[in-house]
C-alpha cells in the first residue's frame, strides 16, 4: 500500500516537529511519497523578491527551491529515502522505482505543492493522500473568523470544492487548492486533512482512524 504525505511548509519552521515526522516515517511500513512545502524560508525570500519587483514566476521559483531544501532536510533524517530531491514527475517516477520513500518539493512555477502531491498520488495509485495542514480539519467557514463554523469530519469532494470556492475564505485559510482537488477527485483518491502539528495523526490514519477530516468521492 502506497501513501502520499503532503507536509505544510510551516512544519519545517519547527525543528523538533521535523525530527518527529522523520521518526514516525522511519517506523511506518509500506511505501511513502512525501511532498514538502516551502515554509518561512519561502515566505521570506518571496517577500524580498516581490519588494524588489521580481516577476511572479521568479517568486514561484524561490518557493520551489525552498520546498526542495526542506525536502532534502527530511531525506537526511530518513533511513530508506531516495537520496535526491526529484525536480519533476519523470525524476520522481524514476526515484519511486528505486526506493521505498521518496521526498520531493515543488515541480514548476504556477503549481502548488498541494497539486504536486495530488499528481504524485495519482501517479503511484496511492491508497490515500494525507495532508498535514495548518488547521486541524475542514470547516464550513474559516473557524478563526467565524466561531459558528462547523467542523466536518467526513465530506465528499463536491462539498469540499464548494467550501474552497467560498468567498468567505481568505487566503490564509490554507487547505488545498481547487486544481489539486480536481486531480484527486478524478482518480477518486481519499484525502485526510489533519493538524500538521500532530504528526502522530499519520499513524492514526494507518490504523484506520480519522484524526481530522476525511474526503471521499
UniProtKB/Swiss-Prot annotation:
Q: Name one GO biological process term.
A: 'de novo' CTP biosynthetic process
Q: Which reaction(s) are listed as its catalytic activity?
A: UMP + ATP = UDP + ADP
Q: How is its activity regulated?
A: Inhibited by UTP.
Database matches in Pfam families: AA_kinase
What GO cellular component term, any one, is given?
A: cytoplasm
Q: Using the UniProt record, give the first listed, main subcellular location.
A: cytoplasm
Gene3D superfamilies in the record: Acetylglutamate kinase-like (3.40.1160.10)
Which GO molecular-function terms appear in the entry? ATP binding; UMP kinase activity
Listed SUPFAM superfamilies: Carbamate kinase-like
Name recorded for this polypeptide:
Uridylate kinase
Subcellular location field: Cytoplasm
What is its pathway? Pyrimidine metabolism; CTP biosynthesis via de novo pathway; UDP from UMP (UMPK route): step 1/1
Amino acid at each position: 500500500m502506497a501513501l502520499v504525505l503532503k507536509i505544510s511548509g510551516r512544519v519545517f519552521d519547527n525543528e523538533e516537529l521535523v525530527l518527529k515526522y522523520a521518526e514516525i516515517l522511519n517506523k511506518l511500513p509500506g511505501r511513502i511519497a512525501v511532498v514538502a512545502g516551502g515554509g518561512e524560508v519561502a515566505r521570506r525570500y518571496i517577500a524580498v523578491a516581490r519588494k524588489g519587483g521580481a516577476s511572479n514566476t521568479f517568486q514561484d521559483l524561490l518557493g520551489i527551491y525552498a520546498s526542495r531544501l526542506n525536502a532534502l532536510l527530511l531525506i537526511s533524517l530518513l533511513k530508506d529515502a531516495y537520496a535526491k530531491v526529484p525536480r519533476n514527475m519523470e525524476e520522481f517516477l524514476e526515484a519511486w522505482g528505486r526506493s521505498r520513500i521518496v521526498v520531493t518539493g515543488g515541480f514548476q512555477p504556477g503549481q502548488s505543492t498541494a497539486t504536486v502531491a495530488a499528481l504524485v498520488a495519482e501517479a503511484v495509485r496511492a491508497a490515500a493522500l494525507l495532508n498535514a495542514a495548518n488547521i486541524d480539519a475542514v470547516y464550513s467557514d474559516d473557524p478563526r473568523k467565524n466561531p459558528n463554523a462547523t467542523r466536518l469530519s467526513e465530506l465528499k469532494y463536491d462539498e469540499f470544492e464548494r467550501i474552497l470556492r467560498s468567498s468567505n475564505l481568505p487566503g490564509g485559510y490554507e487547505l488545498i487548492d481547487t486544481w489539486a482537488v480536481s486531480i484527486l477527485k478524478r482518480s477518486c483518491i481519499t484525502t485526510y486533512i489533519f493538524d500538521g502539528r500532530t504528526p502522530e495523526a499519520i499513524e492514526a490514519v494507518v490504523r484506520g482512524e480519522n484524526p481530522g477530516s476525511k474526503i471521499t468521492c
